[in-house]
Regions:
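Short, small-residue-biased leader/transition segments that mark boundaries at the very start
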Residues: 9-22
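Active-site-proximal segment of RNA-dependent polymerases
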Residues: 34-52
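A short, polar/proline- and glycine-enriched secondary-structure boundary/capping micro-motif
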Residues: 30-36, 204-209
């Protein structure tokens, strides 16, 4: 799939890089003004033509076009919502995982940033990095449940779909929250949490009967552990003395489930 290996490309609402996208939630992005633009799939204009993926890469392969940055996370404007349907934001996901398991994490994160609830009113900014592992792929995978297109999903000996897209074995989420009206230069103003989620089709959940939010706690880990698993230095713009402290541990009771 297309990535910038030695550079990044950034717009007002998203960043393209080798490893991750960094959706930023604040007083602007945490509001909901528009609804999802279903099936508004589009090529990302920031990508060089040689790196672009279009819809033909995502059809008749048994996998969903799974959002990394969720559509509902970019509902403050029509343009921002359309950007979530760029193929640079899509990852091949098993149908039951996308619609019944991963969606619960999307809904959980979304609930944290809404200003009309107790948790969202405490934090003025929440930073989220999401992605799939490209060094750990679903190799020689043979699905037992057909995808939304009616095709049985499968990958080759390298972990690629029939159309040539890599299928992550794990998905990850890193979250950093900053308390409103608190100094930006002290560690107690921040809290972090990570999630490490195995990509499987046997969780037994559906869109109508998704994972209970409380059960997402089983996937929670510290940012330090997530960095060890992914090789990514999350939230590296924090001063080291803050980063070292807030990434070393997490407290489940600090978050609203």
């Amino acid at each position: 799939p297309p990535f910038f290996f030695n550079d990044t490309a950034t717009t007002e609402t998203y960043t393209l890089s080798l490893h991750d996208a960094l959706p930023i939630y604040d007083a602007i992005t945490g509001v909901k003004n528009v609804t999802r633009s279903d099936d508004a799939w589009a090529v990302d204009p920031l990508l060089p033509e040689s790196m672009r993926v279009d819809n033909s890469w995502h059809t008749n392969d048994g996998f969903d076009r799974g959002h990394l940055c969720a559509s509902d996370d970019r509902s403050f404007s029509t343009e921002a919502n359309k950007q979530t349907f760029y193929f640079s934001n899509m990852s091949p996901q098993l149908n039951s995982f996308n619609g019944g398991y991963w969606v619960t994490f999307e809904q959980l994160l979304n609930s944290w940033v809404r200003k009309d609830n107790a948790f969202g009113s405490v934090y003025d900014k929440i930073y989220v990095a999401k992605g799939g592992t490209l060094d750990k792929l679903l190799i020689d995978y043979k699905g037992t449940k057909a995808g939304g297109d009616g095709v049985m999903p499968a990958t080759d000996s390298k972990g690629f779909t029939s159309k040539g897209l890599p299928v992550p074995q794990y998905y990850f989420i890193a979250v950093l929250a900053h308390r409103a009206n608190q100094p930006v230069d002290i560690a107690t103003s921040y809290q972090t949490i990570g999630f490490w989620v195995e990509h499987r089709d046997d969780y037994g959940y559906t869109f109508e009967h998704p994972l209970n939010r409380d059960d997402t706690k089983a996937n929670a880990i510290s940012i330090d552990e997530l960095e060890s698993k992914t090789g990514i230095d999350f939230f590296c713009n924090l001063p080291d003395y803050i980063e070292d402290e807030v990434e070393s541990s997490y407290n489940l009771t600090d978050w609203a489930w």
